[in-house]
């Protein structure tokens, strides 16, 4: 049988029909180190692809149960920015198509900024609908962060077109009349919620980068508004902006305001 060049093998590997293909056994017997290294990389890539597909099927469990019940438009809901001392709380709602496949999708907190940005673009391209709700720091101070988060989620759902038939929500209840399921750690257990977590996180991070350009002395692009030593020191030195949550204890304490 013909001995392939390494370049020919690179082109051939994607065509092989698994290890039962007679050409696979021929390649395994090839003693050239370059060929064996190529095969090892190919096997690892296939293992990664298999793991990604298995993870995707795990993430789609709740969605598939609803599809089986005849429910088509399922929106995942999640938020970003409940804990920071500055900036808005952002919620997102995402309806994915039934045939969606987004390998690498996961809870946004588990992903690098570059991976989140890449998935953000993929979600935008494939989603049936995306809605975003933003509630400002002033509104958070007026309502409290829990109520503000619920209102951000309600805004995100209202922004969806077409409207969803059912909601999967990360650990909260959205104030609306739609049927919904509250899932603990939903962003790690539902594809729709994980997609919403990406949209919410990237949207809020971009917002904070814009604030960093307006208020460079606070370091918003580095800490995203969280209460880091750098941020607290900046508040003590420069005071607060309109984007700071004055009702949050660390901000009050940094300003010397009693609870």
UniProtKB/Swiss-Prot annotation:
GO terms for molecular function: manganese ion binding; RNA binding; RNA-DNA hybrid ribonuclease activity. A divalent metal cation binds at residues 78-79, 170. InterPro entries: RNase_HII (IPR022898), RNase_HII/HIII (IPR001352), RNase_HII/HIII_dom (IPR024567), RNaseH-like_sf (IPR012337), RNaseH_sf (IPR036397). One of its GO terms (cellular component) is ribonuclease H2 complex. It comes from Geobacillus thermodenitrificans (strain NG80-2). Endonuclease that specifically degrades the RNA of RNA-DNA hybrids. The lineage of its organism: Bacteria, Bacillati, Bacillota, Bacilli, Bacillales. This is Ribonuclease HII. CDD domains: RNase_HII_bacteria_HII_like.
């Amino acid at each position: 049988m013909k001995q392939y060049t390494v370049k020919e093998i690179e082109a051939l590997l994607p065509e092989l029909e698994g290890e039962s293909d007679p050409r696979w056994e021929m390649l395994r017997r090839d003693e050239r180190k370059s060929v064996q290294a190529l095969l090892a990389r190919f096997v690892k890539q296939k293992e990664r692809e298999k793991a990604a597909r298995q993870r995707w099927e795990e993430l789609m469990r709740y969605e598939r149960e609803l599809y089986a019940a005849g429910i088509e438009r399922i929106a995942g809901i999640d938020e970003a920015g409940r804990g920071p001392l500055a900036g808005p709380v952002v919620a997102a709602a995402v309806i994915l198509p039934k045939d969606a496949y987004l390998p690498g999708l996961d809870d946004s907190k588990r992903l690098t900024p570059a991976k989140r940005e890449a998935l953000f673009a993929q979600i935008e391209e494939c989603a049936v609908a995306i809605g975003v709700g933003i509630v400002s720091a002033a509104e958070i101070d007026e309502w409290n962060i829990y109520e503000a988060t619920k209102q951000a989620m309600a805004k995100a759902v209202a922004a969806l077109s077409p409207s969803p038939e059912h909601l999967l929500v990360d650990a909260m209840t959205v104030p609306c009349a739609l049927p919904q399921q509250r899932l603990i750690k939903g962003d790690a257990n539902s594809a729709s919620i994980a997609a919403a977590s990406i949209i919410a996180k990237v949207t809020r991070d971009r917002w904070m980068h814009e604030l960093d350009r307006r208020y460079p002395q606070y370091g918003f692009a580095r800490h995203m508004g969280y209460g880091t030593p750098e941020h607290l020191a900046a508040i003590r030195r420069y005071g607060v902006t309109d984007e700071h949550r004055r009702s949050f204890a660390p901000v009050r304490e940094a300003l010397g305001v009693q609870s």
